[in-house]
Amino acid sequence: MMKAVVDIETDSLDATKIHCIVAQHYRTGETRQWVGKECSQFGEWSGKIDQFIMHNGLSFDGPILNRLANARIKPEQIRDTLIESQLFNPVRDGGHSLEAWGNRLDYQKGKLNEFDDYSSEMLEYCIRDTELTRKLGVTLEEEGRTFSSQAYDLERQVRIIIDKQQDNGFAFNLMEGLVLLAQLQDEQYQLEAQANEMFKPTKVQLKTKVKYIPFNIASRKQIAERLVEKGWNPTKHTDKGNIIINEDVLSTIKDMPEAQMFSRYFLLQKRTGLLKSWIKECQDDERVHGRVLTLRTITGRMAHHKPNMAQVPAVSGQYLIRRLTS
């Protein structure tokens, strides 16, 4: 089987141009390079390779080589050292980047700040990355001896599906989202003003003066103190003895309208936070392309960011915002 370690340098993460490609024979270390217009010739050469060893090759290098270098690399041909690193130990100190592995293997990754145009320094940087990926491949072969090939194949297939999900994103009506955000924020401000009328500032006697601490409706500690003053007898506490205040607890206090007001405020906090994150990440195509890390935790659970799509409210929840995503 012909195996090659491959790395590329492009003009950006959303690449429109490949500046250079470097490939090394996995066993012998024999190196080949393609620069500028030569990159279009990579596709013909790549047809001789059975396995491509790349760091983040499934999500980045492979698709870009297929799109811009006339390659026809299949996902099952890619051995992705990023996925292997995450699979074999999801919580490595320092993370799973090639730079982090360079530090571990005492073969530091190069430094390069300018990617807009090709330079000889860029080629040296790419060569260094390829050499480091080769060393990493050997290291992970040894580390992964107790893992089956099926485990890697499964994670590869999951990554492919998630990449499609990220590329597609979901539709988001930005204008309606902005209107709804303004409505919810208006209600928040009204509840804040109402709370300040209900609960006057707390008087604190200092040595030489009196200090007044205004009521903060977002402070769970202050909410607990004021409800206790009104006769509430809390039954749920943290390990440190602090009173637990959340929507579930507040919803059980039926005889205090203040508790229902606080519960409502917490709901509005969550929904406005969610809306702000969606609005921030909405792209020109009017879609939100949330990022998903498939092997982020020791349990194998996925992690989400930009925005956190794991926090979408249930169908039964208030302000589901379904109309904004249809």
Q: Positions of the model-derived regions?
A:
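A general structural motif
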Residues: 1, 48-50
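Conserved "right-hand" nucleotidyltransferase catalytic core of DNA-directed polymerases
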Residues: 1-9, 13-14, 22, 103-104, ...
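Active-site-proximal helix-loop-helix substrate-binding element of RNase H-like nuclease domains
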Residues: 14-19, 23-43, 50-144, 152-162
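A generic alpha-helix structural signal
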Residues: 43-46, 181
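Short loop/turn elements that form and flank the Walker-type P-loop nucleotide-binding site
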Residues: 47-48, 326
